[in-house]
Every structure is written in C-alpha cells, then in structure tokens.
Amino acid sequence: KKRGGRLMAPIEFQKLEGKLKSSKSTSIISSEFFSEADSTQLTNMAKRLNGFDVQIIFTWRPLPFMLASSYQQYLKYGLKKSYSEWLESIFAKPGEAKFTPSFWKRNLQGDVVARWAKTFGAENISLIAVDESKPTYLYETFANLVGIPKGILKEPVHMEMNRSLTFSEASLLLEINRTYPKDLDWDSYEIFIRKGNIKALTRSDKHDSNDEKILTPDWAIEKAAELNSQSVAKIKSLGIKVVGDLDRSDFSRIPTGLNLPVTAIPIETVARAMIGVNMDSIKRMHGRAITKEFFHRLKKIIKARLRLN
C-alpha cells in the first residue's frame, strides 16, 4: 500500500487468458505474490483457468531462514523498526504482523499451501524443498516437474549482484527511513533511496571487513522453528507431492546473536551509497511528475468550476 503496489486492471487478466488459449505449449506463470492470494481470489482464478491442465509448484525454505532476509526487504520499503522490534512484532501473535502484514500471509506456509490445495486439488500441487548447497537443484527439479528440458532454466550469467545488507548498512537504511521527510512521496524514495543509495551497496561485493551480518536472536529462531514444524506437519497432511527434504533443520547455519548498536558508519560505505542514484529511474520520474502535476491541476480546475456552478 502506497509503496509502488497497484491493482491490475481486469483487461490484463483477459489478455493473459488469451495468450494461454493461443499457446500450444506449456505456459509458466510465476509470481511471489501468489502466496498472498486469499480463498476468494483463488476461487476466481480457478474459474478463469477452467479447462486448462493446471499444475501448481511451490518453492519452500524453512521459516527460520526467512527472518533476516524478509526484514531487509521490508527495510527497502521504508520500515522504521529495528530488527529486534520487528521480530517482537511478528511473534507477538503469529498470523498477525502490525507493521508488515504481508509477512504472515506469505510465511504461514502450511496455510498457504492448504488454500491452494483446497481450490486446485492436492493432486495438482507440488512443492520443492530448496537445497542451497546444490546451485542447480531448484532449476533442474522445477524443469523435471514441468516437463521441459534441463538447461533451459538456469542462473542468469550477467545477473546484477544483489547481496544481503550488512548490519551497518541496514542500520544506515533504518536511520534514513526514520528521518525521511513525510512530505516526499514513494516515487522519490524508490528512485533515490531504494533504487539509488541502497542498491549501490547491495550490487557490490565491497563492504567493511569488520562489519557484522544481521544476527538473529536465539529466541526468534526457536519460535520460527516451532511454527515451521507446524507448517511442515500441515503440508505433509495435505497429500501433495514433495520433492526434497521437508524435515531439514540445519538452523545452526543462521548467524545468531545480538548486534551491538551502530554509532558510526565507515566513510567508504557512505560514499558508495551517495553515488548510487539510478539515472534510468530519474528519467522515469519525469513522466510520473508530469502526470501527477496534471491531475493536481485538473482537480483544482474541477473544484473551481463546481463552486461557480
């Protein structure tokens, strides 16, 4: 909400249906936002796809591995809470998240899969338990399930780096979010902060060698592991096809502990962030600014004419 998201017009889905009907081969539709679909939306989707041979494929990682990475993504959308504050908010009442409601919509994984299984049938649902130790595992397993030749799906060769933030970098972004002027809109934040300063940091492997990773406290790992076990049990009870190790519990790989507050940021880190404005984004901003100003002026004209009448 107010962070670049928008509802798709019905015509876009009609176009998609047309493409599916005209296609003579396997079509793949993929979006991370499908995990947030509620029962009503899924029922409508099933009606629109009636007549097609639909197979649903989930990729799955244990909940404890999702905590630090999810927090970083929310930071990039303007979150103003520290990691510890955010963890306390999501675990205060699992299923509800005051500051980031989409977190549990996506990560109560047993509930997510159950909704899809109820709508499309468990026999049409598969889940791939991701194995990070095997770089090609996800691509090869997915290709096998879909029935396409191996090698078509692979890691992009020239993909831009998108590493995790260090704790100091995350602290810098948190402070920016907390002090960001309220009178500036999302477009400005996205261009200058999200796709500018912060992207400049994450697209480079350069960082202060003394900087820590974001550490997750033991209590949060334990809470997440407990909820993960519940989700795994629910997924197993659904009778869907599972590929990989759903019982993995290698949570000792997660950096744990408590980061000390950051009181100073290395000057090199600040310099890299400051030169990160994306020029392509700035070009797009011109069009947005003109559109915004046009509707602002149109609104004033309409109000003035209504007063005259």
List each language-model region with its residue ranges:
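Anion-recognition interface
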Residues: K1-N309
